[in-house]
Amino acid sequence: MYFTEGVHKTQGDSTKRKPNQIIMDSKTLESHLWEAANILRGSPVDRTDWKSYILPLLFFKRICDVWDEEYAEMVEMYGEDFTDEHRFQIPEGAHWNDVRETPKNVGTALQNALRAIEAANQEHLYGVFGDAQWTNKERLPDALLKDLLEHFSALDLGNSHVQSDIIGDAYEYLIKQFADATNKKAGEFYTPRSVVRLMVDILSPKSGETIYDPACGTGGMLLGAVQHVRDKGGDPRTFFGKLFGQERNLTTASVARMNLLLHGIEDFAIERGDTLRNPIFTDPSTGGLATFDCVIANPPFSLKNWGREIWESDPWGRAFAGLPTDNSGDFAWVQHMVTSMALGNGRMAVVLPQGALFRGGVEGNIRQYLLQQDLIETVIGLAPNLFYGTGLAACILILRKRKPQAKKEKVLIVDASELYRKGRAQNFLDIEHATEILSWVQEYKDVKDRARIVDLNEIEEEDWTLNISRYVLPPIGEDIPPLGEAIADFKTALNDAREAEERLKTLMTEGGWLDD
Protein backbone atom coordinates (compact mmCIF):
# COMPACT_ATOMS: atom_id res chain seq x y z
CA MET A 1 0.00 0.00 0.00
CA TYR A 2 1.43 3.34 -1.05
CA PHE A 3 1.35 6.84 0.44
CA THR A 4 1.90 10.23 -1.11
CA GLU A 5 4.98 12.21 -0.21
CA GLY A 6 2.77 14.91 1.32
CA VAL A 7 1.52 12.51 3.94
CA HIS A 8 5.06 11.85 5.19
CA LYS A 9 5.83 15.45 5.99
CA THR A 10 2.72 16.01 8.10
CA GLN A 11 3.20 12.92 10.24
CA GLY A 12 6.91 12.17 10.38
CA ASP A 13 7.57 13.94 13.69
CA SER A 14 5.45 11.44 15.58
CA THR A 15 8.08 8.72 15.16
CA LYS A 16 10.16 10.08 18.02
CA ARG A 17 9.50 8.40 21.33
CA LYS A 18 8.04 10.70 23.96
CA PRO A 19 9.85 10.79 27.32
CA ASN A 20 6.74 9.72 29.24
CA GLN A 21 5.87 6.77 27.01
CA ILE A 22 5.64 3.33 28.56
CA ILE A 23 7.49 0.25 27.31
CA MET A 24 4.99 -2.51 27.94
CA ASP A 25 4.89 -6.04 29.16
CA SER A 26 1.46 -7.63 28.96
CA LYS A 27 0.42 -6.81 32.54
CA THR A 28 1.46 -3.17 32.24
CA LEU A 29 -0.37 -2.85 28.95
CA GLU A 30 -3.53 -4.50 30.22
CA SER A 31 -3.61 -2.36 33.35
CA HIS A 32 -3.10 0.86 31.40
CA LEU A 33 -5.77 -0.04 28.87
CA TRP A 34 -8.33 -0.86 31.54
CA GLU A 35 -7.66 2.52 33.16
CA ALA A 36 -9.29 4.00 30.05
CA ALA A 37 -12.54 2.48 31.29
CA ASN A 38 -12.11 4.34 34.57
CA ILE A 39 -11.99 7.59 32.60
CA LEU A 40 -15.46 6.76 31.26
CA ARG A 41 -16.75 5.66 34.65
CA GLY A 42 -19.26 8.20 35.90
CA SER A 43 -19.62 9.77 32.45
CA PRO A 44 -22.87 9.76 30.43
CA VAL A 45 -21.51 6.76 28.48
CA ASP A 46 -23.23 3.60 29.71
CA ARG A 47 -20.85 0.80 30.66
CA THR A 48 -22.47 -1.46 28.06
CA ASP A 49 -21.10 0.96 25.43
CA TRP A 50 -17.56 1.35 26.77
CA LYS A 51 -16.16 -1.16 24.31
CA SER A 52 -17.62 0.81 21.40
CA TYR A 53 -15.27 3.68 22.23
CA ILE A 54 -12.20 2.21 23.92
CA LEU A 55 -11.51 -0.65 21.50
CA PRO A 56 -11.56 1.55 18.35
CA LEU A 57 -9.22 4.02 20.07
CA LEU A 58 -6.78 1.21 20.83
CA PHE A 59 -6.88 0.03 17.22
CA PHE A 60 -6.52 3.59 15.87
CA LYS A 61 -3.47 4.21 18.07
CA ARG A 62 -1.90 0.90 17.11
CA ILE A 63 -2.11 1.37 13.34
CA CYS A 64 -0.82 4.95 13.59
CA ASP A 65 2.14 3.93 15.75
CA VAL A 66 3.00 1.08 13.39
CA TRP A 67 2.72 3.51 10.46
CA ASP A 68 5.13 5.92 12.18
CA GLU A 69 7.57 3.13 12.92
CA GLU A 70 7.55 1.89 9.33
CA TYR A 71 8.04 5.43 8.05
CA ALA A 72 11.00 6.09 10.36
CA GLU A 73 12.68 2.88 9.22
CA MET A 74 12.29 3.87 5.57
CA VAL A 75 13.70 7.36 6.22
CA GLU A 76 16.69 5.85 7.99
CA MET A 77 17.34 3.46 5.11
CA TYR A 78 16.63 5.67 2.09
CA GLY A 79 16.36 9.29 3.24
CA GLU A 80 13.34 11.46 2.45
CA ASP A 81 13.00 10.53 -1.24
CA PHE A 82 11.32 7.12 -1.46
CA THR A 83 8.03 5.50 -2.34
CA ASP A 84 6.46 4.70 1.00
CA GLU A 85 4.74 1.36 1.49
CA HIS A 86 2.63 0.45 4.50
CA ARG A 87 0.26 -2.22 5.63
CA PHE A 88 -2.48 0.41 6.06
CA GLN A 89 -2.82 3.88 4.63
CA ILE A 90 -3.22 6.83 6.98
CA PRO A 91 -4.56 9.73 4.87
CA GLU A 92 -3.32 13.26 5.45
CA GLY A 93 -5.05 14.81 8.44
CA ALA A 94 -6.29 11.46 9.76
CA HIS A 95 -3.34 10.52 11.98
CA TRP A 96 -3.70 10.08 15.73
CA ASN A 97 -1.61 13.20 16.33
CA ASP A 98 -3.87 15.26 14.07
CA VAL A 99 -6.84 14.36 16.25
CA ARG A 100 -4.88 14.78 19.47
CA GLU A 101 -3.90 18.32 18.51
CA THR A 102 -7.46 19.36 17.63
CA PRO A 103 -8.46 22.16 20.07
CA LYS A 104 -12.25 21.79 19.85
CA ASN A 105 -14.92 19.59 18.26
CA VAL A 106 -12.64 16.67 19.00
CA GLY A 107 -15.35 14.09 18.35
CA THR A 108 -15.91 15.42 14.85
CA ALA A 109 -12.18 15.34 14.11
CA LEU A 110 -11.95 11.79 15.45
CA GLN A 111 -14.94 10.52 13.51
CA ASN A 112 -13.64 12.12 10.30
CA ALA A 113 -10.23 10.52 10.80
CA LEU A 114 -11.68 7.05 11.39
CA ARG A 115 -13.93 7.28 8.34
CA ALA A 116 -11.02 8.52 6.20
CA ILE A 117 -8.89 5.55 7.25
CA GLU A 118 -11.73 3.14 6.47
CA ALA A 119 -12.23 4.72 3.05
CA ALA A 120 -8.50 4.56 2.26
CA ASN A 121 -8.30 0.87 3.21
CA GLN A 122 -11.63 -0.45 1.99
CA GLU A 123 -10.41 -3.98 1.33
CA HIS A 124 -9.38 -4.59 4.94
CA LEU A 125 -10.74 -1.82 7.15
CA TYR A 126 -14.04 -0.64 5.73
CA GLY A 127 -16.49 -0.36 8.65
CA VAL A 128 -13.93 -1.68 11.14
CA PHE A 129 -14.35 1.20 13.61
CA GLY A 130 -18.06 0.55 14.07
CA ASP A 131 -20.83 3.10 14.43
CA ALA A 132 -20.04 4.82 17.74
CA GLN A 133 -21.39 8.38 17.88
CA TRP A 134 -18.18 10.30 18.50
CA THR A 135 -19.82 13.66 17.73
CA ASN A 136 -22.42 13.46 20.52
CA LYS A 137 -21.08 16.09 22.92
CA GLU A 138 -23.67 15.29 25.57
CA ARG A 139 -22.13 11.84 25.93
CA LEU A 140 -18.58 12.69 24.86
CA PRO A 141 -17.66 16.29 25.63
CA ASP A 142 -14.33 17.54 24.31
CA ALA A 143 -12.71 17.35 27.75
CA LEU A 144 -13.60 13.66 28.15
CA LEU A 145 -12.31 12.77 24.69
CA LYS A 146 -9.09 14.68 25.30
CA ASP A 147 -8.58 12.74 28.54
CA LEU A 148 -8.97 9.48 26.62
CA LEU A 149 -6.63 10.60 23.84
CA GLU A 150 -3.96 11.69 26.31
CA HIS A 151 -4.30 8.44 28.21
CA PHE A 152 -3.66 6.39 25.06
CA SER A 153 -0.92 8.78 23.93
CA ALA A 154 1.18 7.63 26.88
CA LEU A 155 1.54 4.30 25.06
CA ASP A 156 3.80 3.58 22.12
CA LEU A 157 2.03 0.68 20.40
CA GLY A 158 4.53 0.20 17.59
CA ASN A 159 5.95 -3.25 16.87
CA SER A 160 9.25 -2.45 18.58
CA HIS A 161 7.41 -1.75 21.84
CA VAL A 162 4.66 -4.36 21.81
CA GLN A 163 4.40 -7.47 19.65
CA SER A 164 1.17 -8.40 17.91
CA ASP A 165 0.50 -11.36 20.20
CA ILE A 166 0.85 -9.17 23.30
CA ILE A 167 -1.40 -6.42 21.99
CA GLY A 168 -3.81 -9.04 20.68
CA ASP A 169 -3.97 -10.68 24.08
CA ALA A 170 -4.45 -7.26 25.69
CA TYR A 171 -7.36 -6.62 23.34
CA GLU A 172 -8.87 -9.96 24.37
CA TYR A 173 -8.30 -8.98 28.00
CA LEU A 174 -10.31 -5.79 27.43
CA ILE A 175 -13.13 -7.75 25.81
CA LYS A 176 -13.19 -10.06 28.84
CA GLN A 177 -13.24 -7.09 31.22
CA PHE A 178 -16.12 -5.51 29.32
CA ALA A 179 -17.94 -8.84 29.47
CA ASP A 180 -17.45 -8.98 33.25
CA ALA A 181 -18.67 -5.39 33.59
CA THR A 182 -21.88 -5.95 31.63
CA ASN A 183 -22.58 -9.65 32.41
CA LYS A 184 -26.10 -10.12 31.05
CA LYS A 185 -25.31 -8.32 27.80
CA ALA A 186 -21.96 -10.08 27.49
CA GLY A 187 -23.50 -13.36 26.39
CA GLU A 188 -24.31 -11.67 23.10
CA PHE A 189 -20.65 -11.28 22.18
CA TYR A 190 -18.35 -13.30 24.45
CA THR A 191 -17.78 -17.01 25.04
CA PRO A 192 -15.54 -18.02 27.99
CA ARG A 193 -12.19 -18.81 26.45
CA SER A 194 -11.82 -22.15 28.24
CA VAL A 195 -15.02 -23.29 26.49
CA VAL A 196 -13.66 -22.00 23.18
CA ARG A 197 -10.44 -23.91 23.70
CA LEU A 198 -12.31 -27.12 24.54
CA MET A 199 -14.48 -26.90 21.42
CA VAL A 200 -11.55 -26.07 19.15
CA ASP A 201 -9.36 -28.81 20.60
CA ILE A 202 -12.11 -31.37 20.02
CA LEU A 203 -12.50 -30.32 16.37
CA SER A 204 -8.69 -30.11 16.04
CA PRO A 205 -8.45 -27.90 12.93
CA LYS A 206 -5.46 -28.58 10.70
CA SER A 207 -3.26 -26.13 8.85
CA GLY A 208 -4.99 -24.82 5.75
CA GLU A 209 -8.50 -25.96 6.68
CA THR A 210 -11.44 -23.57 6.44
CA ILE A 211 -13.09 -22.39 9.67
CA TYR A 212 -16.56 -20.83 9.91
CA ASP A 213 -18.44 -19.29 12.83
CA PRO A 214 -21.99 -18.25 11.89
CA ALA A 215 -22.45 -16.33 15.19
CA CYS A 216 -18.90 -15.11 15.58
CA GLY A 217 -19.27 -12.48 18.31
CA THR A 218 -15.85 -10.95 18.94
CA GLY A 219 -14.01 -13.63 16.96
CA GLY A 220 -12.87 -15.85 19.82
CA MET A 221 -13.65 -19.14 18.06
CA LEU A 222 -11.69 -18.13 14.94
CA LEU A 223 -8.73 -17.00 17.04
CA GLY A 224 -8.94 -20.25 18.99
CA ALA A 225 -8.52 -22.23 15.77
CA VAL A 226 -5.42 -20.23 14.84
CA GLN A 227 -3.96 -20.66 18.32
CA HIS A 228 -4.64 -24.41 18.23
CA VAL A 229 -2.61 -24.82 15.06
CA ARG A 230 0.17 -22.62 16.46
CA ASP A 231 0.29 -24.71 19.66
CA LYS A 232 0.61 -27.86 17.55
CA GLY A 233 3.63 -26.41 15.73
CA GLY A 234 1.73 -25.51 12.56
CA ASP A 235 1.89 -22.28 10.60
CA PRO A 236 -1.13 -20.07 11.40
CA ARG A 237 -0.55 -18.18 8.16
CA THR A 238 -2.07 -21.15 6.35
CA PHE A 239 -5.41 -19.89 7.70
CA PHE A 240 -5.11 -16.59 5.86
CA GLY A 241 -8.10 -16.37 3.56
CA LYS A 242 -9.74 -19.34 5.28
CA LEU A 243 -11.39 -17.80 8.35
CA PHE A 244 -15.04 -16.82 7.99
CA GLY A 245 -17.53 -15.33 10.42
CA GLN A 246 -20.93 -13.67 10.37
CA GLU A 247 -22.29 -11.48 13.16
CA ARG A 248 -25.60 -9.64 13.35
CA ASN A 249 -24.49 -6.78 15.62
CA LEU A 250 -22.46 -4.09 13.82
CA THR A 251 -20.37 -3.08 16.83
CA THR A 252 -19.58 -6.69 17.71
CA ALA A 253 -18.62 -7.49 14.10
CA SER A 254 -16.27 -4.50 14.15
CA VAL A 255 -14.71 -5.70 17.41
CA ALA A 256 -14.14 -9.14 15.85
CA ARG A 257 -12.37 -7.65 12.84
CA MET A 258 -10.12 -5.48 15.00
CA ASN A 259 -9.43 -8.51 17.20
CA LEU A 260 -8.16 -10.60 14.29
CA LEU A 261 -6.12 -7.75 12.83
CA LEU A 262 -4.46 -6.99 16.17
CA HIS A 263 -3.50 -10.67 16.42
CA GLY A 264 -1.64 -10.33 13.13
CA ILE A 265 -4.24 -12.13 11.01
CA GLU A 266 -4.51 -10.19 7.78
CA ASP A 267 -6.79 -12.12 5.46
CA PHE A 268 -10.21 -13.16 6.72
CA ALA A 269 -13.89 -12.46 6.12
CA ILE A 270 -16.08 -11.14 8.94
CA GLU A 271 -19.45 -10.05 7.56
CA ARG A 272 -22.29 -8.30 9.30
CA GLY A 273 -25.74 -9.81 8.86
CA ASP A 274 -28.47 -12.06 10.24
CA THR A 275 -27.19 -15.57 9.54
CA LEU A 276 -30.53 -17.35 9.86
CA ARG A 277 -32.38 -14.88 7.63
CA ASN A 278 -29.62 -13.89 5.24
CA PRO A 279 -26.51 -16.08 5.21
CA ILE A 280 -23.64 -14.22 3.54
CA PHE A 281 -21.34 -17.12 2.65
CA THR A 282 -22.75 -18.96 -0.35
CA ASP A 283 -21.33 -20.98 -3.22
CA PRO A 284 -22.42 -19.76 -6.67
CA SER A 285 -21.08 -22.94 -8.27
CA THR A 286 -23.58 -25.11 -6.37
CA GLY A 287 -26.30 -22.56 -5.68
CA GLY A 288 -26.15 -23.55 -2.01
CA LEU A 289 -24.36 -22.44 1.11
CA ALA A 290 -20.58 -22.38 1.19
CA THR A 291 -19.17 -25.35 3.10
CA PHE A 292 -16.27 -25.49 5.54
CA ASP A 293 -14.03 -28.05 7.20
CA CYS A 294 -14.79 -26.81 10.74
CA VAL A 295 -17.99 -25.05 11.78
CA ILE A 296 -18.06 -23.78 15.34
CA ALA A 297 -20.43 -21.48 17.23
CA ASN A 298 -22.03 -20.37 20.47
CA PRO A 299 -25.28 -18.95 19.06
CA PRO A 300 -27.90 -17.12 21.15
CA PHE A 301 -29.78 -19.56 23.38
CA SER A 302 -33.40 -20.29 22.40
CA LEU A 303 -33.62 -17.24 20.14
CA LYS A 304 -37.19 -16.08 19.54
CA ASN A 305 -38.46 -14.62 16.25
CA TRP A 306 -35.38 -15.98 14.54
CA GLY A 307 -36.78 -16.02 10.99
CA ARG A 308 -39.07 -19.02 10.76
CA GLU A 309 -41.08 -17.30 8.02
CA ILE A 310 -37.96 -17.34 5.81
CA TRP A 311 -37.34 -21.01 6.49
CA GLU A 312 -40.84 -22.04 5.43
CA SER A 313 -39.41 -21.86 1.91
CA ASP A 314 -35.71 -21.55 2.70
CA PRO A 315 -33.73 -21.20 -0.55
CA TRP A 316 -30.71 -22.83 1.07
CA GLY A 317 -32.46 -26.06 2.10
CA ARG A 318 -31.60 -25.73 5.76
CA ALA A 319 -34.87 -27.09 7.18
CA PHE A 320 -33.91 -30.59 6.02
CA ALA A 321 -34.76 -32.19 9.38
CA GLY A 322 -37.76 -30.07 10.28
CA LEU A 323 -38.95 -26.50 10.81
CA PRO A 324 -38.35 -25.29 14.39
CA THR A 325 -40.98 -23.23 16.17
CA ASP A 326 -40.70 -19.46 16.28
CA ASN A 327 -40.04 -19.62 20.04
CA SER A 328 -36.60 -21.23 19.82
CA GLY A 329 -33.95 -21.03 17.13
CA ASP A 330 -31.63 -23.64 18.67
CA PHE A 331 -32.19 -26.27 15.99
CA ALA A 332 -32.27 -23.66 13.25
CA TRP A 333 -28.66 -22.90 14.14
CA VAL A 334 -27.82 -26.61 14.25
CA GLN A 335 -29.33 -27.23 10.82
CA HIS A 336 -27.61 -24.17 9.35
CA MET A 337 -24.29 -25.45 10.66
CA VAL A 338 -24.87 -29.00 9.40
CA THR A 339 -25.66 -27.58 5.95
CA SER A 340 -22.40 -25.59 6.15
CA MET A 341 -20.21 -28.64 6.86
CA ALA A 342 -18.00 -29.84 4.03
CA LEU A 343 -18.39 -33.36 2.73
CA GLY A 344 -15.71 -35.76 3.84
CA ASN A 345 -14.02 -34.36 6.92
CA GLY A 346 -16.58 -31.67 7.81
CA ARG A 347 -17.26 -31.41 11.54
CA MET A 348 -18.92 -28.96 13.89
CA ALA A 349 -19.18 -27.96 17.54
CA VAL A 350 -22.09 -25.94 18.90
CA VAL A 351 -23.11 -24.71 22.35
CA LEU A 352 -26.81 -25.13 23.19
CA PRO A 353 -28.97 -24.99 26.31
CA GLN A 354 -29.39 -28.50 27.72
CA GLY A 355 -33.11 -28.32 27.04
CA ALA A 356 -32.26 -28.96 23.40
CA LEU A 357 -31.24 -32.49 24.43
CA PHE A 358 -34.69 -33.56 25.57
CA ARG A 359 -37.39 -31.12 24.42
CA GLY A 360 -40.14 -32.83 22.45
CA GLY A 361 -42.34 -31.78 19.56
CA VAL A 362 -40.65 -30.62 16.38
CA GLU A 363 -37.31 -30.30 18.19
CA GLY A 364 -37.55 -33.93 19.24
CA ASN A 365 -38.23 -34.87 15.62
CA ILE A 366 -35.21 -32.91 14.40
CA ARG A 367 -33.01 -34.49 17.06
CA GLN A 368 -34.28 -37.93 16.04
CA TYR A 369 -33.45 -37.24 12.39
CA LEU A 370 -29.92 -36.11 13.21
CA LEU A 371 -29.38 -39.25 15.29
CA GLN A 372 -30.83 -41.56 12.64
CA GLN A 373 -28.53 -39.98 10.06
CA ASP A 374 -25.66 -40.76 12.45
CA LEU A 375 -24.45 -37.16 12.53
CA ILE A 376 -24.19 -36.68 16.31
CA GLU A 377 -20.88 -37.94 17.64
CA THR A 378 -20.56 -36.49 21.16
CA VAL A 379 -22.76 -34.76 23.74
CA ILE A 380 -21.10 -32.91 26.63
CA GLY A 381 -23.20 -31.63 29.52
CA LEU A 382 -21.58 -28.64 31.21
CA ALA A 383 -22.08 -27.13 34.65
CA PRO A 384 -24.71 -24.41 35.12
CA ASN A 385 -23.94 -20.69 35.13
CA LEU A 386 -20.77 -20.85 33.01
CA PHE A 387 -21.98 -18.36 30.42
CA TYR A 388 -22.67 -14.66 30.73
CA GLY A 389 -26.29 -13.64 30.99
CA THR A 390 -27.77 -17.05 31.82
CA GLY A 391 -27.64 -19.44 34.73
CA LEU A 392 -28.78 -22.31 32.52
CA ALA A 393 -26.68 -25.41 32.14
CA ALA A 394 -25.39 -25.68 28.58
CA CYS A 395 -24.12 -28.53 26.47
CA ILE A 396 -21.73 -28.94 23.57
CA LEU A 397 -22.78 -31.05 20.60
CA ILE A 398 -20.16 -32.45 18.25
CA LEU A 399 -21.45 -33.51 14.83
CA ARG A 400 -19.54 -34.99 11.92
CA LYS A 401 -20.49 -35.55 8.29
CA ARG A 402 -18.81 -38.93 8.21
CA LYS A 403 -17.93 -40.64 11.44
CA PRO A 404 -14.99 -43.05 11.56
CA GLN A 405 -16.08 -46.67 11.49
CA ALA A 406 -15.44 -47.22 15.21
CA LYS A 407 -17.90 -44.46 16.12
CA LYS A 408 -20.72 -45.27 13.72
CA GLU A 409 -24.17 -45.67 15.30
CA LYS A 410 -22.78 -44.61 18.67
CA VAL A 411 -22.84 -41.41 20.69
CA LEU A 412 -20.38 -40.53 23.44
CA ILE A 413 -22.35 -38.88 26.26
CA VAL A 414 -20.31 -36.95 28.82
CA ASP A 415 -21.50 -35.58 32.16
CA ALA A 416 -19.12 -32.73 33.03
CA SER A 417 -21.60 -30.99 35.33
CA GLU A 418 -19.33 -31.38 38.36
CA LEU A 419 -16.30 -29.85 36.67
CA TYR A 420 -16.26 -26.17 37.52
CA ARG A 421 -14.93 -23.60 39.94
CA LYS A 422 -17.60 -21.73 41.82
CA GLY A 423 -17.46 -17.95 41.66
CA ARG A 424 -19.42 -15.23 43.42
CA ALA A 425 -21.77 -14.49 40.52
CA GLN A 426 -20.71 -17.06 37.95
CA ASN A 427 -19.11 -20.48 37.68
CA PHE A 428 -15.90 -21.06 35.75
CA LEU A 429 -14.62 -23.89 33.58
CA ASP A 430 -10.90 -23.79 34.26
CA ILE A 431 -8.24 -25.11 31.92
CA GLU A 432 -7.74 -28.26 34.00
CA HIS A 433 -11.47 -29.00 33.70
CA ALA A 434 -11.40 -28.52 29.93
CA THR A 435 -8.31 -30.71 29.68
CA GLU A 436 -10.03 -33.54 31.56
CA ILE A 437 -13.14 -33.34 29.38
CA LEU A 438 -10.98 -33.32 26.26
CA SER A 439 -9.19 -36.48 27.40
CA TRP A 440 -12.52 -38.31 27.80
CA VAL A 441 -13.61 -37.25 24.31
CA GLN A 442 -10.32 -38.14 22.65
CA GLU A 443 -9.98 -41.50 24.38
CA TYR A 444 -13.59 -42.29 23.42
CA LYS A 445 -14.32 -44.86 26.10
CA ASP A 446 -16.52 -45.30 29.14
CA VAL A 447 -15.46 -43.39 32.25
CA LYS A 448 -17.24 -44.37 35.46
CA ASP A 449 -19.97 -41.87 36.39
CA ARG A 450 -18.62 -39.43 33.78
CA ALA A 451 -18.82 -40.71 30.22
CA ARG A 452 -20.45 -43.54 28.33
CA ILE A 453 -20.60 -44.74 24.73
CA VAL A 454 -24.27 -45.33 23.93
CA ASP A 455 -25.61 -47.31 20.96
CA LEU A 456 -28.28 -45.68 18.82
CA ASN A 457 -30.56 -48.63 19.61
CA GLU A 458 -30.56 -47.67 23.28
CA ILE A 459 -31.22 -44.02 22.42
CA GLU A 460 -34.16 -45.14 20.27
CA GLU A 461 -35.53 -47.11 23.23
CA GLU A 462 -35.36 -43.87 25.23
CA ASP A 463 -37.50 -42.17 22.56
CA TRP A 464 -34.50 -40.32 21.07
CA THR A 465 -33.84 -38.20 24.12
CA LEU A 466 -30.25 -37.20 24.84
CA ASN A 467 -30.99 -36.25 28.43
CA ILE A 468 -27.64 -37.01 30.01
CA SER A 469 -29.02 -38.48 33.24
CA ARG A 470 -30.72 -41.23 31.21
CA TYR A 471 -27.34 -42.62 30.24
CA VAL A 472 -24.73 -41.38 32.73
CA LEU A 473 -25.68 -41.56 36.41
CA PRO A 474 -24.29 -38.74 38.55
CA PRO A 475 -21.66 -39.95 41.03
CA ILE A 476 -22.88 -40.75 44.52
CA GLY A 477 -21.17 -38.40 46.96
CA GLU A 478 -18.61 -39.98 49.24
CA ASP A 479 -19.91 -37.88 52.13
CA ILE A 480 -23.32 -39.65 52.25
CA PRO A 481 -23.45 -41.59 55.56
CA PRO A 482 -24.77 -45.15 55.99
CA LEU A 483 -28.55 -45.41 56.41
CA GLY A 484 -28.48 -46.29 60.13
CA GLU A 485 -26.19 -43.37 60.90
CA ALA A 486 -28.37 -41.00 58.87
CA ILE A 487 -31.53 -42.09 60.76
CA ALA A 488 -29.80 -41.63 64.11
CA ASP A 489 -28.62 -38.14 63.12
CA PHE A 490 -32.14 -37.27 61.99
CA LYS A 491 -33.66 -38.36 65.33
CA THR A 492 -31.06 -36.34 67.24
CA ALA A 493 -31.75 -33.25 65.15
CA LEU A 494 -35.52 -33.70 65.61
CA ASN A 495 -35.17 -33.95 69.39
CA ASP A 496 -32.92 -30.87 69.45
CA ALA A 497 -35.49 -28.93 67.43
CA ARG A 498 -38.31 -29.91 69.81
CA GLU A 499 -36.28 -28.92 72.85
CA ALA A 500 -35.42 -25.56 71.27
CA GLU A 501 -39.10 -24.99 70.50
CA GLU A 502 -40.05 -25.67 74.14
CA ARG A 503 -37.36 -23.31 75.44
CA LEU A 504 -38.55 -20.56 73.08
CA LYS A 505 -42.16 -21.10 74.17
CA THR A 506 -41.17 -20.84 77.84
CA LEU A 507 -39.21 -17.63 77.29
CA MET A 508 -42.04 -16.00 75.35
CA THR A 509 -44.60 -17.01 78.01
CA GLU A 510 -42.44 -15.62 80.81
CA GLY A 511 -41.98 -12.39 78.86
CA GLY A 512 -45.69 -11.93 78.39
CA TRP A 513 -45.70 -12.47 74.63
CA LEU A 514 -47.69 -15.71 74.88
CA ASP A 515 -50.62 -16.64 77.10
CA ASP A 516 -50.31 -19.71 79.32
Explain the meaning of each model-derived region.
Residues L29, D46-D49, L144, I166, ...:
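Helical mechanochemical/support elements of P-loop NTPase systems and associated helical scaffolds
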Residues Y2, G6, K16-R17, P284-D516:
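A conserved structural/catalytic subdomain of Rossmann-like adenosyl-cofactor enzymes
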Residues K185-A297, S302-S313, G317, F331-A332, ...:
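Conserved S-adenosyl-L-methionine
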Residues M1-S207, A269-I280, G381-N385, K407-S417, ...:
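Non-catalytic, mostly N-terminal accessory regions of nucleic-acid modification and defense proteins
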Residues I22, E138-P141, N159-Q163, E188, ...:
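Alpha-helix initiation/capping motif
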Residues K61, I175, G219, R230, ...:
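Charged, amphipathic alpha-helical interaction segments
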